[in-house]
Amino acid sequence: MLPAQEKKELVPLGAVMDSLALRYDLDFAYDAAVLRRDSLVSSALPKVFDKQWISTLLSGPQNLEVVFMGQQVIVGRSTPGSRPSALLEVSGRVLAADGSGGLPMVNIGVEGRALGTSTNDEGRFVLRYPRAYIGEALVFSSLGFVSERFSLPQNDSVLEVVLKNYSIHLPEVQVLYTDPDQLMRSVRRRLAQNYPSEPFLLTAFFRETIRQDDEYVEVSEAVVDIYKPSYQAGFASERVRFVKGRKGATARDMEVVQFKLLGGPFHFAQVDVVRNGDFLPDEEGFSAYRYLYKGVDMDNDRVLYRVGFEPLHDEEGLFYRGELRIDKESRAVVRVDFELTPASIRRSRSYLVRRDSRRFRTRPVVARYHLAYRPWGQHWVLSRVRGEVSLRVNDRDRRQRSLFATVSEMLVSDFAPADGQQRIPWSEAYRSDYVLSEQLGTFDPDFWQFYNVVEPDEDLRRVFQEGER
């Protein structure tokens, strides 16, 4: 039942949709044969914008699929091998001009819009977009490469995009040494200018894979909603709501089932080093890290400073080493690559391994992460989080050793400012002790139809094809 907040009476669905469109600047796209505007529904509207309420209203007894893309609300029936007519699709591959092959982790976004995706490890991509976006600029950008722009086509299309390396001949002012400590203090001072001061609602795709000795043993995927508080609300926490998910069948069962790694959508939604202040100096300029200036780079036609960091002391707790890329003009952190130091890896078992068994001896060997932010108006918004953790596992009973490698990636495919009163209710929130694979049901062959996700590579496609049989 819908949570009514205003006077109740039955009115045509079309009237409620018109009210929502005016109140929240929404544009509805749907097939009139599927969604009947003359059907009667309660006129009671929520006091604040609520995606879940709108989805429940529009899905109706037919259980229609409802997808939000920016201000577009797309409603359709999930049928095998088809998409709603309101959605178009551009797919293809991004290649390096030097002939080295497909480019992974290329940022793909509609200029001036929140909608976006990314290439997979083979450089392949699919972007689904509303017809209302036809003719707008689709931008392909990657660190160290010249960006390319295309107009979004009127029909489903296939693109082959070739990105050229930057020939870096930067003006003298851009290559002069910059004091890294002063640079990091300027990053701290400009946080309020560079990152949202209001809460946001993010739509994200999350994939988690586990390999045992280079063979997939567990694959899980999900679309989630994330409530991200203001970057100035330091003590408020993110909330995650599960939308849809699937898991793939694997050729072998995971032999070591008694341990689970720290991860999942809940934890990766909180891996925001800018909002958490990780690796940054405090307001007085003090830091637990030593900063090293490493030159400049280019991304999306912007000059980026490269600043390395390493802990001043590495004797207790967990510390990282890595590199930040900072936008020269705005002083915003736009990319972070970091990993646990060797000493911290040796201390990390109790942190990384959430469930264990006395039968197994687990030893983490690497834990590395990547974060990226994308520009939106005058601010930067979290765009992508990727984590890789490898462990050596010794089965004491079988006297067998295995190498387990898990890769988790979260791609923010859409976002919008949220009303300050709107939060994901605790009853709907993904809990910290949830394990993603345990929350998913049977395989859904139509999972890809409505959402922007990172395309699976060839090995993963085989895993999911097994699930269709």
Mark where each language-model region is.
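Short, acidic Ser/Thr/Gly-rich low-complexity loop/linker segments typical of extracellular
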Residues: 113-124
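Short, acidic, small-residue-rich periplasmic hinge/interaction motif at the N-terminus
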Residues: 17, 21-24, 73-87, 91-95, ...
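Extended beta-strand-rich segments in extracellular/periplasmic secretory proteins, especially
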Residues: 277-328, 332-340, 375, 380
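A short, solvent-exposed loop/turn motif at the edges and junctions
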Residues: 59-64, 137-150
